[in-house]
Amino acid sequence: DRTLAICKDLGCDIIDMPINCGLTVGFQTAARYAVDHGYDYMVQFDADGQHCPEYIKVLVDRAQSDGSDIVIGSRFVSVRKDKTLRMIGSRMITGLIKILTGKRISDPTSGFRLFGRDILKKYYYDNTLNPEPESLALFLKQGYSISEVQVKMRERQGGESYLNPVRSMQYMVRVFVTLLVVQWFR
C-alpha cells in the first residue's frame, strides 16, 4: 500500500518499522513515540480507507470537551448493528464488557480510536496491553473514561482483511478468554 508515501507527502510524523511486527507492537511503538514527543492524543486509524479523516476532529473535540481518556469512532451510537455474523460477535463482546464493567461500549471492535496521554503512558510502560476490546474493558475497570461518537465508515478502499471465518472465531475466543480469565489477574 502507499501509506508511507502518502504520509510523507502530507508531512506527517512517521515511524517506519523495518518489518511488520503486527498491530500490537506497532501500536505500542506509536504510543511510546507520542509520549516521548509530548503528544496529548494519538489516533488509531486504519489505512484501508474505511475511516474518514474528517472525523478525527470530532474525536479530539469530544476528548477536550468531556475529558475522555479514550474516544471511539463508533458505527453504532445512533445506528443499530446489522445481524451479520461479525456484528453478532461484536454484540457479544459489548454484552460481556457490560457485564464485567457495568459500562456499555456500543462498538468495542472499532479500530478508529483516540487515546489520551494517560492511556498512552499505560501502553508505554505495560507491553502486555493491546489495542483491542479487552484493554478497553481493563481501562474501564481501572476507572478511565471511554466515550463514543457516531461516525460513518466507508467500505474497505484497499487491502484485504486478515479476518476470515476461522480467524474470526479465534479472535472471539481470544477476546472472551482474556476478558473472562486473564483480566482477573491484572
Q: Whereabouts are the PLM-identified features?
A:
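Acidic helix N-cap motif at the loop->helix transition within catalytic regions
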Residues: 1-10
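Hydrophobic residues within well-ordered alpha-helices
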Residues: 7, 63, 138-141
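Conserved dinucleotide-binding and phosphotransfer motif residues
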Residues: 10, 37, 142
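Acceptor/aglycone-binding surface of glycosyltransferases and processive sugar-polymer synthases
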Residues: 13-36, 41, 53-129, 155-179, ...
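Glycine/small-residue-rich loop that forms an oxyanion/phosphate-binding "nest" at active or ligand-binding sites
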Residues: 50
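Catalytic donor-sugar/metal-binding loop of nucleotide-sugar-dependent glycosyltransferases
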Residues: 103-104, 126-127, 137-154
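Cell-envelope/extracellular polymer assembly enzymes that use nucleotide-activated donors
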Residues: 134
